[in-house]
Regions:
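PLP-dependent enzyme catalytic core of the Aspartate aminotransferase-like
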Residues: 115-116, 131-191
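Active-site C-terminal subdomain of aminotransferase-like
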Residues: 1-98, 102-130, 137
Protein backbone atom coordinates (compact mmCIF):
# COMPACT_ATOMS: atom_id res chain seq x y z
CA UNK A 1 0.00 0.00 0.00
CA UNK A 2 1.10 3.55 -0.58
CA UNK A 3 3.29 2.75 -3.63
CA UNK A 4 2.44 4.15 -7.03
CA UNK A 5 3.06 1.68 -9.81
CA UNK A 6 4.35 3.60 -12.86
CA UNK A 7 2.60 1.31 -15.33
CA UNK A 8 -0.75 2.01 -13.66
CA UNK A 9 -0.31 5.80 -13.47
CA UNK A 10 0.70 6.12 -17.13
CA UNK A 11 4.02 7.78 -16.25
CA UNK A 12 6.91 7.41 -18.65
CA UNK A 13 9.56 6.97 -15.94
CA UNK A 14 12.64 6.90 -18.20
CA UNK A 15 11.50 10.12 -19.88
CA UNK A 16 10.78 11.82 -16.55
CA UNK A 17 14.17 10.82 -15.12
CA UNK A 18 16.02 11.94 -18.25
CA UNK A 19 14.17 15.26 -18.41
CA UNK A 20 14.86 15.97 -14.76
CA UNK A 21 18.52 14.90 -14.86
CA UNK A 22 19.31 16.75 -18.11
CA UNK A 23 17.52 19.93 -17.05
CA UNK A 24 19.22 19.99 -13.67
CA UNK A 25 22.61 19.27 -15.23
CA UNK A 26 22.27 21.80 -18.04
CA UNK A 27 20.25 24.56 -16.40
CA UNK A 28 20.70 24.06 -12.68
CA UNK A 29 17.98 24.03 -10.10
CA UNK A 30 15.34 26.72 -9.73
CA UNK A 31 16.54 30.00 -8.24
CA UNK A 32 15.80 30.87 -4.67
CA UNK A 33 13.59 33.98 -4.40
CA UNK A 34 16.40 36.12 -2.95
CA UNK A 35 18.75 35.16 -5.78
CA UNK A 36 16.08 35.92 -8.39
CA UNK A 37 15.50 39.33 -6.79
CA UNK A 38 19.24 40.10 -6.81
CA UNK A 39 19.47 39.21 -10.51
CA UNK A 40 16.50 41.43 -11.35
CA UNK A 41 18.08 44.30 -9.40
CA UNK A 42 21.37 43.83 -11.27
CA UNK A 43 19.70 43.74 -14.68
CA UNK A 44 18.28 47.21 -14.12
CA UNK A 45 21.76 48.76 -14.41
CA UNK A 46 23.48 46.29 -16.74
CA UNK A 47 23.44 48.66 -19.75
CA UNK A 48 25.08 51.45 -17.75
CA UNK A 49 27.69 49.10 -16.31
CA UNK A 50 28.54 47.58 -19.70
CA UNK A 51 28.87 51.05 -21.23
CA UNK A 52 31.39 51.97 -18.52
CA UNK A 53 33.23 48.62 -18.88
CA UNK A 54 33.61 49.19 -22.63
CA UNK A 55 34.66 52.84 -22.38
CA UNK A 56 37.26 52.00 -19.73
CA UNK A 57 38.56 49.01 -21.69
CA UNK A 58 39.10 51.07 -24.84
CA UNK A 59 41.04 53.72 -22.91
CA UNK A 60 43.11 50.99 -21.21
CA UNK A 61 43.84 49.36 -24.58
CA UNK A 62 45.08 52.69 -25.97
CA UNK A 63 47.35 53.07 -22.93
CA UNK A 64 48.66 49.49 -23.11
CA UNK A 65 49.48 49.73 -26.84
CA UNK A 66 52.00 52.46 -26.03
CA UNK A 67 53.59 50.92 -22.91
CA UNK A 68 57.19 49.72 -23.33
CA UNK A 69 56.65 46.55 -21.24
CA UNK A 70 53.71 45.32 -23.37
CA UNK A 71 54.61 43.39 -26.51
CA UNK A 72 51.06 42.60 -27.63
CA UNK A 73 47.52 43.73 -26.81
CA UNK A 74 44.71 41.26 -27.47
CA UNK A 75 41.35 43.00 -27.89
CA UNK A 76 38.52 42.80 -30.43
CA UNK A 77 39.67 45.86 -32.35
CA UNK A 78 43.37 44.88 -32.25
CA UNK A 79 43.03 41.64 -34.27
CA UNK A 80 43.65 41.22 -37.98
CA UNK A 81 41.24 42.84 -40.40
CA UNK A 82 38.44 40.22 -40.66
CA UNK A 83 38.11 39.82 -36.88
CA UNK A 84 38.28 43.55 -36.19
CA UNK A 85 35.72 44.19 -38.95
CA UNK A 86 33.33 41.61 -37.46
CA UNK A 87 33.74 43.15 -34.01
CA UNK A 88 32.86 46.57 -35.40
CA UNK A 89 29.89 45.13 -37.30
CA UNK A 90 28.33 43.05 -34.50
CA UNK A 91 29.46 44.65 -31.24
CA UNK A 92 27.70 47.99 -31.65
CA UNK A 93 27.54 48.90 -27.95
CA UNK A 94 31.25 48.41 -27.30
CA UNK A 95 33.80 45.62 -27.38
CA UNK A 96 33.57 44.37 -23.81
CA UNK A 97 35.90 44.50 -20.81
CA UNK A 98 38.24 41.59 -21.66
CA UNK A 99 41.80 42.57 -22.57
CA UNK A 100 44.75 40.24 -23.00
CA UNK A 101 48.37 41.39 -22.92
CA UNK A 102 51.76 39.83 -23.52
CA UNK A 103 54.57 41.19 -21.36
CA UNK A 104 58.30 41.42 -21.93
CA UNK A 105 60.14 39.12 -19.56
CA UNK A 106 58.12 35.88 -19.62
CA UNK A 107 56.73 34.11 -16.59
CA UNK A 108 58.64 36.17 -14.01
CA UNK A 109 57.33 39.40 -15.51
CA UNK A 110 53.79 38.00 -15.44
CA UNK A 111 54.05 36.95 -11.79
CA UNK A 112 55.63 40.23 -10.73
CA UNK A 113 53.00 42.21 -12.63
CA UNK A 114 50.13 40.40 -10.88
CA UNK A 115 51.77 40.68 -7.45
CA UNK A 116 52.34 44.42 -8.02
CA UNK A 117 48.74 45.29 -8.84
CA UNK A 118 47.11 47.18 -5.98
CA UNK A 119 43.59 47.80 -7.25
CA UNK A 120 42.95 44.77 -9.45
CA UNK A 121 41.64 41.59 -7.86
CA UNK A 122 43.71 38.50 -8.66
CA UNK A 123 40.98 35.99 -9.53
CA UNK A 124 40.09 33.60 -12.35
CA UNK A 125 36.50 34.74 -12.88
CA UNK A 126 35.32 37.48 -15.22
CA UNK A 127 32.41 39.88 -15.47
CA UNK A 128 32.68 41.70 -12.15
CA UNK A 129 32.28 45.46 -11.75
CA UNK A 130 35.75 45.43 -10.17
CA UNK A 131 38.88 45.17 -12.29
CA UNK A 132 40.28 41.63 -12.34
CA UNK A 133 43.58 40.14 -13.50
CA UNK A 134 45.13 36.70 -13.79
CA UNK A 135 48.40 35.23 -15.08
CA UNK A 136 47.25 31.82 -16.39
CA UNK A 137 50.76 30.33 -16.82
CA UNK A 138 51.38 30.55 -13.07
CA UNK A 139 47.82 29.78 -11.90
CA UNK A 140 45.03 28.11 -13.87
CA UNK A 141 47.35 26.60 -16.50
CA UNK A 142 50.42 25.98 -14.32
CA UNK A 143 50.14 22.19 -14.63
CA UNK A 144 50.58 22.35 -18.44
CA UNK A 145 53.90 21.99 -20.26
CA UNK A 146 55.06 24.42 -22.98
CA UNK A 147 53.39 22.46 -25.80
CA UNK A 148 50.07 22.25 -23.93
CA UNK A 149 50.24 25.95 -23.05
CA UNK A 150 50.78 26.82 -26.72
CA UNK A 151 47.87 24.58 -27.75
CA UNK A 152 45.60 26.38 -25.29
CA UNK A 153 46.70 29.81 -26.55
CA UNK A 154 48.49 30.74 -23.33
CA UNK A 155 52.08 31.94 -23.27
CA UNK A 156 54.36 32.40 -20.27
CA UNK A 157 53.92 36.17 -20.50
CA UNK A 158 50.15 36.30 -21.16
CA UNK A 159 47.97 38.18 -18.65
CA UNK A 160 44.19 38.38 -18.85
CA UNK A 161 42.49 41.53 -17.62
CA UNK A 162 38.81 42.21 -17.09
CA UNK A 163 38.47 45.98 -16.90
CA UNK A 164 36.02 47.17 -14.26
CA UNK A 165 33.93 50.30 -13.87
CA UNK A 166 36.24 52.14 -11.48
CA UNK A 167 37.59 55.52 -12.59
CA UNK A 168 39.73 54.85 -15.65
CA UNK A 169 42.59 57.04 -14.40
CA UNK A 170 42.89 54.83 -11.31
CA UNK A 171 42.89 51.68 -13.46
CA UNK A 172 45.60 53.03 -15.78
CA UNK A 173 47.71 54.26 -12.87
CA UNK A 174 47.61 50.81 -11.25
CA UNK A 175 48.48 49.07 -14.52
CA UNK A 176 51.33 51.50 -15.18
CA UNK A 177 53.00 51.02 -11.80
CA UNK A 178 52.65 47.21 -12.04
CA UNK A 179 54.00 47.14 -15.60
CA UNK A 180 57.00 49.21 -14.58
CA UNK A 181 57.73 46.79 -11.72
CA UNK A 182 57.25 43.74 -13.98
CA UNK A 183 60.38 44.57 -15.97
CA UNK A 184 62.46 44.34 -12.82
CA UNK A 185 61.26 40.80 -12.06
CA UNK A 186 62.15 39.26 -8.73
CA UNK A 187 64.79 40.98 -6.69
CA UNK A 188 67.86 38.83 -6.29
CA UNK A 189 70.51 39.05 -3.61
CA UNK A 190 73.85 40.31 -4.82
CA UNK A 191 77.00 39.09 -3.07
Amino acid sequence: MGKAVPELTGANVPFAVRARVCLLRDLGSALAPDNAFAIIQGLETVALRMKQHCENAEKVVNFLKKHKEVTKVIYSTEHNKPIADRAKKYLKGGYGPMVGIELKGGIEAGKTFIESLKMFYHVANIGDVRSLAIHPASTTHSQLNEKELAASGVTQSYVRLCIGIEHVDDIIEDLNQALNKSSKGKLRAVS
